UniProtKB/Swiss-Prot annotation:
SMART domains: ANK
Annotated protein name in UniProt: Ankyrin repeat domain-containing protein 18B
Biased composition (Basic residues): 280-293
PROSITE patterns xref list: ANK_REP_REGION, ANK_REPEAT
Keyword Cytoplasm set for record: no
Record-linked Gene3D superfamilies: Ankyrin repeat-containing domain (1.25.40.20)
Gene it is expressed from: ANKRD18B
Length: 1011
């Protein structure tokens, strides 16, 4: 009995553990590859992203992931209220089920998301849908002890008596899961107390099995049936007694006592409330029953007395007795009567026992035969099952070993692939990190260079601005100087015109002087003629004196005019000399400033040239280092691509392309730097060449001016020589005239002095002009030196031009090379882009193939795992079932064997007792036979004695009194005459057989129960 009870308890514990495993996992076990974009957005609670996905594709409203979960399931499981309202507004399916046939309402209740559950209930969700385990939303609310959710579900017409596959209502489920608050809540909401599960266990039995005394008190307060039995025939009190739960036993006993007291009170109240008429009727009925029983007893006694009288008459006829022995016989008769009564009672009991034993023998024989057949079949089935189990165990072990080997192999492959994948990912990440670092370094270097270029350009701009300001100032000064030079040229031209006019005047005067000299010669010739002729001398003298006076006046006027002209010439020469000195000073300043500027500019250009050379060297070094780094990265990429089983030719092409790209990039950088530097230097060279051209132009103009001045000086020299010659000639003529004319000698002396003075003045002017010419020669020498320095500058400029041409040629070569490189770079870029596209396409294809293979492999693995798990589960279940059956059979067999041994011992004890009883019975039979013979003899005597007595019986006889006092039913007296044999050996054997059958039946009763 205890084994059965312990089996029931273990079954309850197993059900509780399975229930905990079933209900413990809340929410979903989510993997990212199982989800779509809308499912990820729903899990995150991103309602905007969900709405965006739905606007793009309205079909995604009820779309499922790879585990058959909708967006509403995931949103309810994670408590995303906004997403749930959005989906319900879009009219999604509210009662849609997942793979376990669970609705979104079940998931919201299971995950204790009350807000989502309330929204679903308000929108009309069905709370009575069952999952694959038969559980409703109320079961999940009970498991989570959600009283508020349970109230909401009950207010929306949830079934409080819904049964799951185990036959548990929410109340029974709450007791199984030890949820006392939910039990109280369900009892308040009028849950059925008398509900039964698949094992016919009530709520009280479950509470006793789980040792929940508080729930037992609640159920007893609700007047639950105590005597209800489960499928094993056990009550709650039996389970409490078996499990030694004394507190629960006391509670049940107290409840029983209360129930009995209440029942007695109710009976008393009923009897008190009954009318007296009913009591009278009951009394009459009782009296009638007693009268009938008394009449039957009297009739039976009369019949017995008549039979006994007949027997006594016969005995009296056979053996007459004396009246003296009447007292003894009377005592013997009373003793015999008592013995007969005992014997009759014993015989009736024996008869009933025999009938029962026969009936039971037949039943037991049939049952034993059936049991033997069942045992034989059971043994055969056990043997067959053992053989089948051994075979299946061997097969399953082989299959398990094969599956384990396959799993190990697949796991090793998976681990290898994962390891390779991780290694490749690590390599790719390292390459990406290296590339990122290289790119960052490259970007930093470019930023530095850009900053340097910006600073350099800013410096250039500032320099250009300063140069522009200086050049603007110089241009302004040049404009002023050019204006001044222009004005000086205009004045010089005016002076030239005046000089020409004076030259013309001098020529006219010289012509006039020549004419005067001719006139003087003619006059002298005439005077000579006159002297020769001496006619009219005085008149002619007066005429000659008048003519001389007029000629002297003319000469004076001419001298005055010459003086004025000479003064004007001197003034003009002074002004021209001053202007020339100013112009020369300005030119010297300009030339000196230009030379200084050119020297400074040349120094700056040389410094910049050296700086650019140093930068080019640095860039070449950096380029070499980058090329080394890029080649290392290329080698790593080549190794990486080789690992992905790419062909060698595109890899070599990509490496060559990368090398060409690097070279083109470096050449681009160099060209860019060289282009930036020569552009700036070109501007500087242009400015220098413009300055040089201006200097050359100014030098040419100065040379032209010097030539013109030299020509003018030579002209002046020629004019002076002409004037000196003319004056000498004129003086000679004057002297000759005065030599001839003694009268006018003084005047001629005066004139000669004046002419000498004029000649001295002219000589002084000549010396001044010669000094000026010397100064001009010195200036010319200075200008020649300057021209020589300018020649050197020109040589330097020519060198610079040559360098510039060389640089331009280099730039052109670089441009051509750059164009070629650009063309090659374009081709390389196209080829690279094609290769990149091909590589990307190949990588994408490989990734897609890898992902597809991985997905297929994962699907296959999942299917294999599912199949393996399913097969293993099936095999385990079959093994468990077989083991359970086998264990049950073993336990039953062991129990049967132990009980059989016990029953054998009891049977041996019973046989001993039976043998002792049979011996006692034989002894009692012998005694009875002796007594019966004595009684028979005494009956015959009494009959004979009574036959001699009158027929009416004496009421004072004790035998008659005893017969009247004994109430014997007719049915217990046998109709046939009872024969008492002296010896009956079959009775003991029959008793033995009946006892053995009883013992066997009592021993095999639990086996029948188990079967």
């Amino acid at each position: 009995m205890r084994k059965l009870l312990s089996f029931g308890r273990r079954l309850g514990q197993a059900l509780l553990s399975s229930m905990d495993q079933e209900y413990a996992g809340r929410g979903y076990h989510i993997r990212d590859w199982e989800l779509r974009k809308i499912h990820r957005a729903a899990i995150k609670g991103d309602a905007a992203e969900v709405e965006h996905c739905l606007t793009r594709r309205f079909r995604d409203l009820d779309v499922r992931d790879r585990k058959d979960r909708t967006v509403l399931h995931l949103a309810c499981a994670h408590g995303r209220v906004q997403v749930v309202t959005l989906l319900l507004d879009r009219k999604c399916q509210i009662n849609i089920c997942d793979r376990l046939n669970r609705t979104p309402l079940m998931k919201a209740v299971h995950c204790q998301e009350e807000a989502c559950a309330i929204i679903l209930l308000k929108r009309g969700a069905n709370p009575n849908i069952k999952d694959i385990y038969g559980n409703t939303a109320l079961h999940y609310a009970v498991y989570n002890e959600g009283t508020s959710l349970a109230e909401r579900l009950l207010s929306h017409h949830a079934n409080i008596e819904a049964l799951n596959k185990e036959g548990n209502t929410p109340l029974l489920f709450a007791i199984n899961s030890r949820r006392q608050h939910m039990v109280e809540f369900l009892l308040k909401n009028q849950a059925n107390i008398h509900a039964v599960d698949n094992f016919k266990r009530t709520a009280l039995i479950l509470a006793v099995q789980h040792n929940l005394s508080s729930i037992v008190t609640l159920l007893l307060q609700q007047n639950i049936h105590i005597s209800s039995q489960d499928m094993f025939g056990q009550t709650a009190e039996d389970y409490a007694f078996c499990c030694d739960l004394r507190s629960i036993q006391q509670q049940i006993l107290e409840h029983k006592n209360k129930m009995l007291k209440n029942h007695l009170r109710n009976d008393n109240q009923e009897t008190a409330a009954m009318k007296p008429e009913n009591l009278k009727k009951r009394k009459k009925r009782k009296k009638l029953k007693k009268r009938k029983e008394g009449a039957k007893a009297e009739h039976n006694l009369k019949v017995a007395s008549e039979e006994k009288q007949e027997r006594l008459e016969r005995s009296e006829n056979k053996q007459p007795q004396d009246s003296q022995s009447y007292g003894k016989k009377k005592d013997e008769m009373f003793g015999n009567f008592m013995l007969k009564r005992d014997i009759a009672m014993l015989k009736e009991e024996l008869y009933a026992i025999k009938n029962d034993s026969l009936r039971k023998e037949k039943k037991y024989i049939q049952e034993i035969k059936s049991i033997t057949e069942i045992n034989a079949n059971f043994e055969k089935s056990v043997r067959l099952n053992e053989e089948m189990i051994t075979k299946k165990v061997a097969q399953y072990s082989q299959q398990l070993n094969d599956l384990k080997a396959e799993n190990a192999r697949l796991n090793s492959k998976l681990e290898k692939e994962k390891h390779n994948k991780e290694r490749l990912e690590a390599e790719v990440e390292s390459l990406h990190s290296n590339l990122a670092t290289a790119i960052n370094e490259y970007n930093e270097i470019l930023e530095r260079k850009d900053l340097e270029l910006v600073l350099w350009r800013a410096d250039d701009v500032s320099r250009h601005e300063t140069m522009g300001s200086n050049i603007s100032q110089l241009t302004d000064k040049n404009e002023l100087l050019t204006e001044q030079v222009h004005k000086a040229r205009v004045k010089f031209n005016t002076l030239k015109g005046k000089l020409r006019e004076t030259r013309d005047a001098l020529r006219e005067k010289t012509l006039a002087l020549e004419s005067v000299q001719l006139d003087l010669k003619q006059a002298q010739h005439r005077i000579k003629e006159m002297k020769q002729m001496h006619p009219n001398g005085e008149a002619k003298e007066s005429q000659s004196i008048g003519k001389q006076n007029s000629s002297e006046e003319r000469i004076r006027q001419r001298e005055l005019e010459n003086l004025l002209l000479e003064r004007q010439l001197e003034d003009a020469r002074k002004e021209g000399d001053n202007k020339e000195i100013v112009i020369n000073i300005h030119r010297d300043c300009l030339e000196n400033g230009k030379e200084d500027l050119l020297e400074e500019r040349n120094k700056e250009l040389m410094n910049e040239y050296n700086y650019l050379k140093e930068k080019l060297l640095q860039y070449e070094k950096e380029k070499a280092e980058r090329e080394v780094i890029v080649r290392e990265f290329q080698e790593e990429l080549v190794d990486h691509l080789k690992k992905f089983s790419m062909s060698e030719s595109p890899l070599e092409g990509t490496s060559h392309c990368h090398i060409n790209l690097d070279e083109t990039w470096t050449s681009k950088k160099k060209l860019f730097q060289v282009e930036i530097q020569p552009e700036e230097k070109h501007e500087e060279f242009r400015k220098v060449f413009e300055l040089i051209s201006l200097l050359n132009y100014t030098a040419d103009q100065i040379r032209k001016k010097n030539r013109e001045l030299e020509e003018e000086a030579t002209g002046y020299k020629k004019c002076l020589e002409m004037t000196i010659n003319m004056l000498n000639a004129f003086a000679n003529e004057d002297f000759s005239c005065h030599g001839d004319l003694n009268t006018d000698q003084l005047k001629m002396d005066i004139l000669f002095k004046k002419l000498k003075q004029k000649f001295d003045d002219l000589m002084a002017e000549k010396e001044a002009v010669s000094s000026k010419c010397v100064n001009l020669a010195k200036d010319n020498e200075v200008l020649h030196q300057e021209l020589l320095s300018m020649g050197k500058v020109q040589e330097k400029c020519e060198k610079l031009e040559k360098d510039k041409k060389m640089l331009e040629e280099k730039v052109l070569n670089l441009k051509t090379h750059m164009e070629k490189d650009m063309v090659e770079l374009g081709k390389v870029q196209e080829y690279k882009s094609e290769l990149d596209e091909r590589a990307m396409q190949a990588i994408e294809k490989l990734e897609e193939i890898h992902l597809q293979k991985q997905a297929e492999y994962e699907k296959q693995l999942e299917q294999l795992n599912k199949d393996n798990t399913a097969s293993l589960k099936k095999k385990e279940l079959t093994l468990k079932d077989v083991e359970c059956k086998f264990s049950k059979m073993k336990t039953a067999y062991e129990d049967v064997t132990t009980e059989l041994e016990e029953y054998k011992e009891a049977f041996a004890v019973a046989l001993k007792a039976n043998s002792s009883m049979s011996e006692k019975i034989t002894k009692s039979d012998k005694k009875i036979a002796v007594i019966s013979t004595k009684l028979f003899m005494e009956k015959e005597r009494m009959e004979y004695f009574l036959s001699t007595l009158p027929m009416r019986p004496d009421p004072e006889l004790p035998c008659v009194e005893n017969l009247n006092s004994i109430e014997l039913n007719r049915k217990y007296i046998p109709k046939m005459a009872i024969r008492i044999p002296t010896s009956n050996p079959q009775t003991s054997n029959n008793c033995k057989n009946s006892l053995t059958e009883l013992l066997l039946r009592w021993a095999l009763a639990p086996i029948y129960f188990l079967l």
